[in-house]
C-alpha cells in the first residue's frame, strides 16, 4: 500500500484515534491523498453512540465503498462494529476494527513500525466525513455541533489522559467498544503538557471517556493529575471535559481547593449530570444523588464565581415522567449553566436501558429537547 484516505464521524476521543492512525500510516511510508479514488486504503472512523450517528456512519461506509477503486481496501474504525455487531453482515466486504483493536492494521499494511509504538497525538487534524458531498457533510456537522469540537482549533493542544471508563450506565453502548479504564502514566501526561508549553501552546484540553476516574486503575487520582499539571509554571488555560458528577462528589474538598487556587488557568469544566431526578439516575445506574450534586456545585459557584461549569442532560430516558423532566429543567434554571449539552435518549443495541419498559414517545422527547433549549437560550440572554 502506498496511499491512504481517512474520514471521521467520531467524537473528540475517536478524533485522537484518527490522527494517531494518520501518524502511524505516515510513519510506515503510506502517504495521505485527498483523492479517494487514488487511495489504496480508506479508513472510515465511525460513531454509533446515537442512532442518528450510526446512520450517518453507515451512509459514509456505503459511499466510500462506491467511490473506491476496485482493488482498494476499506477499513471501518471507531465504535460502530462493537456497538451494533449486526452491521458486520451488512458490510461483509470491509474490515472492522474497534478503538481497542487498531493494532490489527499492523498485519493489513505489513507495518515496519507497529501501532503500539506511535505516541498519542497532541494536535488533531480535520478528517471530513464527506469531502465531495457538502450537503451530507453539513448534516454531519449539525449532528456533531454540540460536541464542542474545540479539538479542531489549531491553537489547542490535546492531552489524552485515559481510554475507557469505570461506569456502567444503562443507556451507554460506547463501553462495548472502548472497554475498561486504562490510564496513561502521570509522568507521561506532564511531559506532554510541558512539551506543549515549550512549543508555545496556551490552550490545552484533557480528553478521556471520564476524566474524573483517571488513575483509579494505577493507584492515583484525577486530583493528583490536576495538582501536577497546575504545578507547572506558565501562561495557559486547561479545558477539563467529562468530569463525571460522582467524582465531583468523591473529590469535592480537594477539587474546591484546586478550583479556588487555579480557576484563572481553567477554561471550563464539564460535569455530566444527565438527570436531576434521583429515580431516573438510579435507572441510569449513575452512582450519585442529585442532592449531593446540587450541594457541591452550588458551593463551587458561590466560592469560585470565576469558574465556568457546564453539564450534560439526557431527556426522554425510559420511564421519565413530566415530573422527572421538570426536576432537570429546574436544576438547569437554578444553577444557570452557561452551556448544556442536550441528549435525546436513543435505544442502543444490547444496553440495559433498551430493554426497559416505559419508553417515552418521540414527539414528547422532541418537545422536551426544545424546552431545554428554550431555557438555555433564556439563561444565556441573562448572563450576557
Q: What is each residue range found by the language model?
A:
Residues 1-210, 291-302, 326, 330-334, ...:
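Proteins enriched for Cys/Gly/acidic motifs involved in redox and nucleic-acid/cofactor modification
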Residues 74-78, 83, 198-322, 334:
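Conserved SAM/AdoMet-binding glycine-rich loop
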Residues 179-182, 241, 286, 318, ...:
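Hydrophobic alpha-helical scaffolding
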Residues 353-357:
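Anionic-ligand binding region
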Amino acid at each position: 500500500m502506498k496511499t491512504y484516505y481517512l474520514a471521521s464521524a467520531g467524537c473528540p476521543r475517536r478524533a485522537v484515534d484518527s490522527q494517531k492512525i494518520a501518524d502511524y500510516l505516515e510513519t510506515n511510508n503510506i502517504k495521505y491523498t485527498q483523492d479517494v479514488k487514488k487511495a489504496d486504503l480508506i479508513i472510515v472512523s465511525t460513531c454509533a453512540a446515537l442512532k442518528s450517528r450510526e446512520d450517518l456512519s453507515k451512509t459514509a461506509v456505503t459511499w466510500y465503498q462506491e467511490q473506491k477503486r476496485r482493488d482498494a481496501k476499506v477499513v471501518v474504525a471507531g465504535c460502530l462494529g462493537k456497538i451494533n455487531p449486526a452491521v458486520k453482515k451488512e458490510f461483509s466486504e470491509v474490515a472492522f476494527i474497534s478503538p481497542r483493536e487498531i493494532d490489527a492494521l499492523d498485519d493489513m499494511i505489513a507495518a515496519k513500525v507497529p501501532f503500539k509504538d506511535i505516541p498519542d497525538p497532541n494536535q488533531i487534524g480535520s478528517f471530513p466525513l464527506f469531502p465531495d458531498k457538502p450537503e451530507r457533510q453539513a448534516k454531519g456537522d449539525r449532528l456533531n455541533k454540540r460536541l464542542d469540537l474545540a479539538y479542531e482549533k489549531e491553537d489547542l493542544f490535546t492531552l489524552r489522559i485515559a481510554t475507557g471508563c469505570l461506569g456502567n450506565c444503562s443507556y451507554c453502548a460506547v463501553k462495548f467498544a472502548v472497554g475498561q479504564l486504562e490510564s496513561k502514566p502521570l509522568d507521561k501526561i506532564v511531559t506532554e503538557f510541558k512539551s506543549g508549553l515549550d512549543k508555545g501552546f496556551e490552550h490545552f484540553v484533557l480528553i478521556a471517556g471520564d476524566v474524573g476516574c483517571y488513575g483509579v486503575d494505577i493507584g492515583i487520582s484525577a486530583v493528583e493529575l490536576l495538582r501536577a499539571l497546575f504545578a507547572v509554571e506558565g501562561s495557559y488555560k486547561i479545558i477539563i471535559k467529562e468530569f463525571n458528577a460522582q467524582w465531583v462528589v468523591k473529590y469535592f474538598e480537594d477539587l474546591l481547593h484546586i478550583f479556588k487556587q487555579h480557576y484563572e488557568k481553567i477554561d471550563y469544566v464539564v460535569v455530566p449530570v444527565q438527570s436531576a431526578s434521583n429515580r431516573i439516575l438510579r435507572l441510569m445506574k449513575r452512582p450519585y444523588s442529585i442532592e449531593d450534586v446540587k450541594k457541591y456545585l452550588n458551593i463551587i459557584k458561590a466560592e469560585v464565581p470565576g469558574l465556568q461549569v457546564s453539564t450534560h442532560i439526557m431527556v426522554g430516558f425510559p420511564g421519565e415522567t413530566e415530573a422527572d423532566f421538570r426536576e432537570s429543567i429546574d436544576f438547569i434554571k437554578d444553577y444557570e449553566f452557561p452551556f448544556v449539552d442536550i441528549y435525546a435518549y436513543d435505544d442502543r443495541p444490547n444496553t440495559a436501558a433498551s430493554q426497559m419498559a416505559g419508553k417515552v414517545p418521540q414527539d414528547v422527547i422532541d418537545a422536551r429537547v426544545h424546552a431545554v433549549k428554550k431555557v438555555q437560550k433564556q439563561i444565556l440572554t441573562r448572563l450576557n
